[in-house]
Amino acid sequence: MIVKATEEEIQEIRTKSADALFEGTMKQFHPSAERVNELVGSALEKGCYYLVSRQENKLAGWVLAGPSADFFSKEEIGFIYELYVLPEYRGQGLAKPLMQKAIDELSIKGYPEIRLSVHAGNFAQHVYRELGFIDKQISMSLQVVKRP
């Protein structure tokens, strides 16, 4: 069953979000608890919400979804900020239903488009593509060597 997170579940998610972000960014970003609280707090304040999957009354995974705006046009769009399934529940087919519930809710709210960002090499890309997401833009990076 996928439902909106309770306050208690949101607090539990906050304790696990640093690890989720570390994994989701392909181990490039490991935020402090303070930074996690800033990120989550900011998202929740602007109208985002968590949907959770429970297995035997335990938190198994979550998706964070809500409003965003296109950088160029400022058009309001739906956005999926985070998808995470706890390691002990992986391989049980939880990611796709979490995503579908978020897509359904954002669609009902009338957003003309739903976007997400994903790091290159992230295993979840195949789930996103199976749900119909396509590459829209590519973010590129160049490591610069600091000179003395």
Show where each model-derived region lies:
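Conserved GNAT-fold acetyl-CoA-binding loop/helix
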Residues: 18-39
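Conserved beta-strand in the GNAT
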Residues: 52, 58-67, 79, 84
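A short beta-loop-alpha structural element at the N-terminal edge
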Residues: 1-15
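A short helix-loop-beta-strand connector motif used in the catalytic cores of GNAT acetyltransferases and
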Residues: 41-52, 79
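Conserved acetyl-CoA-binding loop-helix of GNAT-fold acetyltransferases
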Residues: 82-85, 91-104, 130
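Conserved active-site alpha-helix within GNAT-family acetyltransferase domains
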Residues: 96, 120-138, 142
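A conserved beta-turn-beta hairpin within the catalytic core of GNAT-like acetyltransferases
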Residues: 68-80, 90, 136
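Conserved GNAT acetyl-CoA-binding A-motif
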Residues: 106-117
